[in-house]
Structures are given as C-alpha cells and as structure tokens.
Amino acid sequence: MNKTAVQAGAYLHHLAFESSNPARLATFYSNAMDMDVTQLSHSEWRCEGPGRRMIVVPGTDKQLAYAGFACRDQAGLTALRLRAQQEGLEILDSPSPYFQPDAFALCDPNGQTLCFGLAKLAQNHRAGL
C-alpha cells in the first residue's frame, strides 16, 4: 500500500538551519529554548532539550538546511521509501545525525531537503516535564 507521510506515522523530529554565524544562532536558541548546545565540529552545532532538537550549520542566513521527520516504526519508514520510489523521486542519503542508518532524504519541488528515518535514542541529559 502506498502511504503518505501522515499515514506512515511521520512527525517533525528536528530542524537544521543555515547561518552565516552558526555559533551565535545556536547560542541564541540554546538560551531562548533552554537547550544544551554542543559544537561537534567547525561545521555543526546541535541544540538539544527534552522533546526538541535543532542543528545549525554554516550557510546562508534564513535558510532551512533540512527538516527531519521521524517515523514511528520500520513498517512506516519502509512504506514511505517505497512510495517515494514509485513516485520516481530521487532517494538521497540522509544528512541527519538523529536517525538510524536506514534513513533517507528527498528534495521537494523548491529544493528543500526532507529527511525520513527512525529516531535514535535521545542523548540529552535535561529532565522533561
């Protein structure tokens, strides 16, 4: 059966933004949203808190690098990949560090990258409500 993202149980898991000053943007969101910020390399900052994650990478201000949609189970992810293949969409490697290895990405008609995968277990140490 061809499933849409909603039928496959996909939900917005995280966002990745571009910035001409990634450290400044990551620090802003860390402070504004009470998230831990970690610089993983010269090209990646992660902001994490209970139920919220974002990535900041070097690039053009006000640009979405990609959106990460997590599927609730392997069957949903498999169904989404199959539908994308049947629709003739190019399947790309997922740039998301938050998904398991079988994740994939697609580009929408505007060139925005959408990632789909199964979420890895959360690594942040802040307590949720």
Where is each model-derived feature located?
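N-terminal beta-strand motif that seeds the catalytic metal site of vicinal oxygen chelate
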Residues: M1-A23, L64-F69, A127-L129
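Vicinal oxygen chelate
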Residues: M1-T4, Q85-L129
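Short, low-complexity cationic-aromatic patches
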Residues: A5-G9, C47, I55-T60, F104-L106
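Core segments of cupin and vicinal oxygen chelate
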Residues: Q7-R53
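Residues within well-ordered alpha-helical secondary structure of globular protein domains
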Residues: N31, R83-Q86
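Conserved short beta-strand elements that form part of the metal-binding/catalytic scaffold
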Residues: M33-Y66, C71-D73, T113-K120
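Short amphipathic alpha-helices within nucleic acid-binding modules
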Residues: A75-L82
